Amino acid sequence: MDATATDLRVSIAHQTRFAFRLAAALSSPRAHPAAGGAAGAGGSNVAFSPLSLHVALSLVAAGAGGATRDQLVSLLGVPGRGTAEGLHAFAEQVVQLVLADSSPAGGPRVAFADGVFIDSSLSLMKSFKDVAVGKYKAETHSVDFQTKAAEVASQVNSWVDRVTSGLIKEILPPGSVDHTTRLVLGNALYFKGAWTEKFDASKTKDGEFRLLDGKSVLAPFMSTSKKQYLSSYDSLKVLKLPYQKGRDLRQFSMYILLPEAQDGLWSLAAKLNSEPEFLEKRIPTRQVTVGKFKLPKFKISFGFEASDLLKILGLQLPFSSKADLTGMVGSPERHNLFVSSLFHKSFVQVDEEGTEAAAASAAVVSFRSAPVTVDFVADHPFLFLIREDMTGVVLFIGHVVNPLL
């Protein structure tokens, strides 16, 4: 394996680690209210794109300096040897390898866009613009925050609406930008994939889904008798649902991580966070005959302002008056720039046809001896993620506590 491939593998491992750290923080009962505290308390389903957030913060790092850049690299990159340049190289490879649309070739439809909206009184530093446009394929827009902030917010929202095929209509809520805003860095991600093996809608039946509080609801469950990629362990079952492939090497799949315990969701999220290779070691590699199979249909729309959550993870300087973002714009005003907020929204829908989604260790694991058939009954809270299997890049992650929400 050459150095570039090795670097990419290491970068992907850290992107996955970042994904699971965020997922654990969002699913924690102690989650900050501004970062979906209701979700942490078990009150709502969660879906977000760690890849979208990773790219947004990496672009901030392109204009950061000193300790601010170091904090960003520490959270996003390789501890001890990561660099901002490494983040940009990773972003460039992800945009080219993972986020290229494969629908013309018969695979999932993938759309991704980066945007830099800068006040017309300022100009981007050449070094920052070169990275933003060259590595991140960002569009740059000169706008008037100082006298037309509401119109600019509407412009950004329309851009996100277009990229996500109308699934996310508003990334910037009313009042989120004003005359003091100088720069908005945004990205949007859209994914729509059809299952390799679609579910028969006539077999979808209502069944009981048990909630974290012990109550239950009636929800529509998809069912099948076909063989499935499924691995079974003492406290966990992992289901892999592949999407139809295009003619390239990429293979997108959804993974359902179902804890054995009805209330095992939070401890599973914590386990993924504490053991970065936990998932990789449990990915199903062979199809097995299933006995009883039930998977609920679900649709999640989830948004949050991420700065408080990121501060908990140690990223504080970019959001403070001590931020060093002097590499973004060529103006004396650059010394006063900081990230006031980081908005994120995601949408994920799973049904019989497939998925539509948008966003703006060394331990040996032994496989439990599989019986002749394996049941997979997702009738209680579970984690899910959408991943590109060739690279291991996680596009979306979330949890379902109630499929009716």
Curated annotation (Swiss-Prot):
Question: What GO molecular function terms would the record report?
Answer: serine-type endopeptidase inhibitor activity
Can the keyword Disulfide bond be found in this entry's annotation?
no
Keyword Lyase listed: no
**GO cellular component labels:** extracellular space
Domain characteristics, as noted in the entry = The reactive center loop (RCL) extends out from the body of the protein and directs binding to the target protease. The protease cleaves the serpin at the reactive site within the RCL, establishing a covalent linkage between the carboxyl group of the serpin reactive site and the serine hydroxyl of the protease. The resulting inactive serpin-protease complex is highly stable.
Q: What does this protein do?
A: Probable serine protease inhibitor.
Q: Which family does it belong to?
A: Belongs to the serpin family.
Provide the protein name. Answer: Serpin-ZXB
The species this protein was found in: Oryza sativa subsp. japonica (Rice)
